[in-house]
Design a protein with these regions (language model features):
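Conserved short beta-strand edge segments in small beta-sheet-based binding/regulatory domains
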Residues: 80-98
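Short S/T/G/P-rich N-terminal loop/turn motif that feeds into the first structured element of a domain
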Residues: 1-56, 64-74, 94-115
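A short linear boundary/processing microfeature
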Residues: 75-79
């Protein structure tokens, strides 16, 4: 069961780079599918948010083992996709996250500081 996640989020495409952003999304979805088939990630879920006036309009949550996701984050393909995303998407970012049993571990660590 996955205990770790990568949150890959963005706002909207840069004006004039909409087609590049659409093409990038398709290639990245294919790449994430290959990562899942290769056992490097447990799963991934793309999410597009409804209009809300904020600066987050979509994200993909990659789920898996912390060590494997750390390796994925350092792969050349992941790095290249992230660089391209920074040129065609506003507010693009990748953030580490905890899910499943990972949440319990993090809260246990935090609770030490509140005792």
């Amino acid at each position: 069961m996955a205990d770790y996640a990568l949150f890959v989020g963005w706002n909207r495409s840069v004006a004039g780079r909409e087609q590049q952003a659409i093409d990038l999304f398709a290639r990245v979805m294919e790449y994430y599918g290959q990562l899942q088939n290769d056992g490097k990630i447990e799963s991934f879920e793309p999410v597009v948010l409804s209009n809300h006036g904020g600066d987050l309009n979509g994200f993909v949550l990659l789920r898996g083992d912390a060590a494997k996701l750390d390796e994925v984050r350092r792969e050349e393909a992941f790095t290249n996709f992230s660089i391209e995303a920074n040129f065609c998407l506003e507010n693009f970012g990748v953030i580490d996250g905890y899910i499943g049993d990972g949440i319990t571990r993090v809260f246990s660590q935090w609770s030490i500081h509140f005792s």
